[in-house]
């Protein structure tokens, strides 16, 4: 595909991003590639000035650049076609869609699927091999269900939602439109509810509901539990990575992003636009305010204020954590120095 044709197809996005181009270069682009692996015919991107030195080393035929005249001049001198925008990563993400579309089977129902007569199917649905759809299930239009998915009674799926292979959607679950549930995920499973008695643990039945609003994405082998009463809710456009657990009764805001192996205990409330990096753990009933960020492996035992950045376990403000970490590396030497001071004090006393 000619580079100028790529620009034309991105025209609507370009107009909204104050984009500039190098009109004198129009190479054939055959694929996209990382900057350090790109060859002739490849398109890559540079997100910030720190990668400027790589322009001289890359073999890419075209680059998506930030709005930086120095980088643009450098690319031109290298004979590299370029397009510059305020958000190179976003433009690159849109460009990928010109070269790649995820696999989606044609509408139809595989003959091995087991569908209860009481289930309601929308138009142009795709249902793969060995899928089980139980009574009272409602599927919206253009829903895509890959092989070996099990959907319990009464579940609702919104338009264009995709369930990848081997997912399980339990009863009392509502999933909105344009959601993606990746392979092995379990949505609406029983929350961990047991009451201690003299005889042992007494099971609390989980009669609540689980709601995923429109645009939610759940990664492979992640689990979202339903509560004993009330609801577990993940709000619009939140993205959840692989191997993440959201316990019963959690309330997750809009446009959050949780990386792999995040674990939320029961009743946690998370605001909008919260970012939790890998292996963050959040204790029971903790509240996290809008826009907060927790770095990898942070342990959150209590509430976190809106906009706060926290690190460590138990968590502290990130700036304090960095100072403590710098001191931590010097503790052996500091300990030896302290021992010498103690000896000197004892000698002088």
Swiss-Prot record:
Keywords: Acyltransferase, Lipid A biosynthesis, Lipid biosynthesis, Lipid metabolism, Repeat, Transferase. It is an enzyme of class 2 (transferase). Pathway: Bacterial outer membrane biogenesis; LPS lipid A biosynthesis. One of its GO terms (biological process) is lipid A biosynthetic process. It catalyses: a UDP-3-O-[(3R)-3-hydroxyacyl]-alpha-D-glucosamine + a (3R)-hydroxyacyl-[ACP] = a UDP-2-N,3-O-bis[(3R)-3-hydroxyacyl]-alpha-D-glucosamine + holo-[ACP] + H(+). The active site is at residue 248. Its EC number is 2.3.1.191. GO terms for cellular component: carboxysome; membrane. GO terms for molecular function: N-acyltransferase activity; structural constituent of carboxysome shell. HAMAP family: LpxD. Homotrimer. Catalyzes the N-acylation of UDP-3-O-acylglucosamine using 3-hydroxyacyl-ACP as the acyl donor. Is involved in the biosynthesis of lipid A, a phosphorylated glycolipid that anchors the lipopolysaccharide to the outer membrane of the cell. Belongs to the transferase hexapeptide repeat family. LpxD subfamily. This is UDP-3-O-acylglucosamine N-acyltransferase. It comes from Gloeothece citriformis (strain PCC 7424) (Cyanothece sp. (strain PCC 7424)). The gene is lpxD.
């Amino acid at each position: 595909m000619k580079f100028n044709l790529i620009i034309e197809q991105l025209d609507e996005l370009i107009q909204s991003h104050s984009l500039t181009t190098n009109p004198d270069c129009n190479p054939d682009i055959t694929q996209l590639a990382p900057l350090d692996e790109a060859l002739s015919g490849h398109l890559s991107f540079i997100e910030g000035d720190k990668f400027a030195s790589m322009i001289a080393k890359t073999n890419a035929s075209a680059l998506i650049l930030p709005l930086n005249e120095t980088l643009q001049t450098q690319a031109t001198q290298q004979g590299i076609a370029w397009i510059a925008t305020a958000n190179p990563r976003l433009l690159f993400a849109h460009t990928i869609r010109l070269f790649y579309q995820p696999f989606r089977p044609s509408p139809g129902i595989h003959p091995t699927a087991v569908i209860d007569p009481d289930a309601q199917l929308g138009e142009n649905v795709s249902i793969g091999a060995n899928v089980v759809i139980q009574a009272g299930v409602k599927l919206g239009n253009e829903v895509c269900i890959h092989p070996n998915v099990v959907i319990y009674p009464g579940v609702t799926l919104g338009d264009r939602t995709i369930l990848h292979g081997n997912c399980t959607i339990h009863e009392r679950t509502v999933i909105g439109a344009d959601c993606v549930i990746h392979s092995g995920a379990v949505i609406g499973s029983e929350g961990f509810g047991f009451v201690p008695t003299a005889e042992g643990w007494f099971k609390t039945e989980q009669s609540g509901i689980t709601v995923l609003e429109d645009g939610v994405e759940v990664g492979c082998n992640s689990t979202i539990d339903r509560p004993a009463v009330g609801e577990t809710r993940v709000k619009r456009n939140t993205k959840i990575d692989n191997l993440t657990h959201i316990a019963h009764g959690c309330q997750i805001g809009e446009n959050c992003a949780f990386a792999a192996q995040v674990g939320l205990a029961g009743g946690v409330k998370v605001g909008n636009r919260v970012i939790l990096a890998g292996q963050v753990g959040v204790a029971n009933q903790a509240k996290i305010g809008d826009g907060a960020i927790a770095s990898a492996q942070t342990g959150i035992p209590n509430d976190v204020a809106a906009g706060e950045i926290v690190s460590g376990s138990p968590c502290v403000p990130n700036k304090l954590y960095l100072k403590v970490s710098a001191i931590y590396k010097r503790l052996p030497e500091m300990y030896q120095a302290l021992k010498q001071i103690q000896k000197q004090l004892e000698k002088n006393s």
